[in-house]
A protein has these predicted regions:
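Charged/polar, solvent-exposed surface patches and flexible loops
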Residues: 35, 39, 43, 86, ...
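C-terminal folded domains that constitute the principal catalytic or ligand-binding module
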Residues: 222-316
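Membrane-anchoring hydrophobic helices of lipid-metabolizing enzymes
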Residues: 2-135, 299-387
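Soluble catalytic domains of membrane acyltransferases
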Residues: 32, 43-252
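Intrinsically disordered low-complexity regions specifically enriched for long asparagine
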Residues: 1, 154-157, 266
Length: 387
């Protein structure tokens, strides 16, 4: 049910911060990116499926966004979030329900350097709708009317968990429960299955991550692929071809789990409610893994998709992605084009992209290729600045 909070106007601090709704988000950028790149990558490489999204959740409080929440895949570049949001974008656009699309709160480290944006595409995350996950921004987004909200409530610990803790929910942020109660809106969990295999058998140590965070990298995955990253820099963004399955969970109404009013809750109360919700989500995710996570790669399906889309070779393979993303940025940002098609099936397209974007050659140069990429990736960085 709507609460009294839904009838009140935002506090002055929230009103002053509402510029975040439209500072960077460009629906046209997201649509053009999806049509030119993400649809192909999803169709061939990730082969994502939505399970249980037929009856798409509607707001229980019409004045407040639903809070969608999912699990992080540890030790991997966030391709799972990119694929989930792009698939939902297409699903909801097809059904004329873009109002139901969730906009993500993302870790601020992702936007502080170009290096943590896919292939150095500047402001990639924010142009696609992401907002830095700060307390003020979260509270501000609770007054957002155009879309729903999405977050990964495990936060950075969820990103940094090693393969030995795959599919294990870490402690959830209490802010999710607190704001859900205060604004009378439901939490809608969905579970990301097989993303743990985008970068499998990767582990990390806190003492190493303490230093990598200083240069804008949330964690350093220690894996056999790390050597490949050094000698072939494009592998920094590498994802193995795990079939991503997104499974809708049972919506959660935190007000049903407590008899107290929101203002009566202590920090300990919110922590206890968060743990109760974590256990509910863990049980549902375990069932989703049992149903959809036993064959994470499905090599036969991957081979079939490659054959069906062979005219787009090599663009569905990760080594070709740097040129493709860089060419997209050149066309959209530098040349200001709109409603264009990149003609990925044209013979010689990849070689022409390399010629037009010589920086992409650095992705293939062992060790020293990192020098120009790091210069571009850290130029104008916001490290040490508050989001």
């Amino acid at each position: 049910m709507p609460t009294a909070a839904s009838a009140t106007s935002p506090p002055p601090a929230i009103q002053a911060n509402q510029h975040i709704y439209n500072d960077y988000f460009r629906e046209e950028f997201t649509q053009t990116l999806d049509e030119n790149i993400l649809q192909l990558l999803d169709r061939v490489w990730f082969r994502s499926e939505l399970v249980g999204f037929e009856n798409y959740p509607q707001r229980n409080n019409p004045d407040r966004p639903l809070i969608f929440a999912s699990n992080h895949s540890g030790m991997a570049f966030p391709w799972d979030a990119i694929v989930a949001l792009s698939h939902l974008w297409r699903h909801l656009k097809k059904n004329g329900a873009m109002h139901d699309l969730p906009r993500p709160l993302s870790a601020p480290l992702l936007s502080q350097t170009a290096l943590m944006n896919p292939y150095l595409v500047r402001e990639f995350w924010k142009k696609c709708g992401c907002v830095d996950a700060t307390t003020l921004n979260f509270e501000t987004m609770m007054y957002y009317q155009d879309h729903n909200l999405m977050l990964y409530p495990e936060g950075v610990p969820g990103i940094g968990k090693g393969f030995n803790r795959k599919y294990q929910f870490q402690r959830l942020a209490t802010s999710m429960v607190r704001l859900s109660l205060q604004h009378g809106t439901d939490i809608v969990p969905f579970y990301t299955i097989n993303a743990e295999y985008l970068n499998p058998y990767a582990y990390s140590w806190d003492w190493i991550n303490k230093y990598t965070k200083k240069i804008g990298i949330p964690f350093l995955p220690i894996t056999v692929l790390l050597l490949l990253v050094l000698i072939q820099p494009w592998a920094f963004y590498l994802a193995l071809p795990a079939k991503l399955v997104f499974v809708m969970g049972t919506r959660i109404r935190p007000s049903d789990l407590t008899t107290k009013k929101p203002e009566e809750h202590t920090r300990e109360d919110y922590a206890a409610l968060s743990e109760q919700i974590r256990q509910k989500m863990q049980a549902e995710m375990d069932a989703a893994v049992a149903a959809h996570g036993q064959q994470p790669y499905r090599w036969g399906e991957l081979w079939q998709r490659m054959k069906e889309n062979r005219r787009y070779f090599p663009f569905f393979l990760p080594f070709a992605w740097p040129a493709m993303f860089t060419e997209f940025e050149r066309l959209y940002v530098k040349e200001g084009r709109r409603n264009f098609r990149m003609q990925l099936d044209r013979p010689g397209a990849w070689l022409r992209m390399l010629w037009r974007n010589p920086i992409t050659l650095a992705y293939f140069i062992p060790l020293i290729g990192w020098i120009p990429l790091a210069i571009k990736g850290y130029r104008g960085n916001k490290l040490g600045q508050k989001p």
